[in-house]
A protein has these predicted regions:
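N-terminal flexible/basic segments that precede or flank functional cores
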Residues: 1-33
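Short, contiguous, helix-prone interaction/anchoring segments in small proteins
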Residues: 26-46
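Short alpha-helical DNA-recognition segment
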Residues: 40-60
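DNA major-groove recognition helix of helix-turn-helix/homeodomain DNA-binding modules
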Residues: 70-87
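Long, contiguous binding/interaction regions
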Residues: 92
Length: 92
């Protein structure tokens, strides 16, 4: 199954990202790749323009070797209709 078979709207994208956060080892790699996969499910130009980044920057920042700034992550998520929410950690 391809990611674009699962990502149909903002809600399914949020579910996908939340699952990837659970699988992430703490280095952000799973989340970064997940955001990259969601970007590919959209028209990349429609994400790049409101996020004020180039298409090439998007592909570069959200691949396995990417290292996007927190600001870029927020702008890209907002351009996709998503946001970040902080919750208390369970069983710390």
């Amino acid at each position: 199954m391809d990611v674009d078979d699962f990502i149909r709207d903002d809600k399914s994208a949020a579910v996908f990202l939340n699952e990837m956060i659970k699988l992430d080892s703490g280095d952000g790699s799973m989340v970064r790749l997940a955001i990259g996969n969601i970007i590919k499910c959209h028209n990349v130009s429609e994400i790049a323009k409101p996020a004020c980044v180039s298409r090439a920057s998007l592909y570069s920042a959200f691949n396995k070797d990417g290292n996007p700034s927190f600001d870029m992550v927020q702008k890209v998520l907002a351009a996709m209709g998503l946001g970040i929410q902080f919750v208390p950690l369970e069983n710390r």
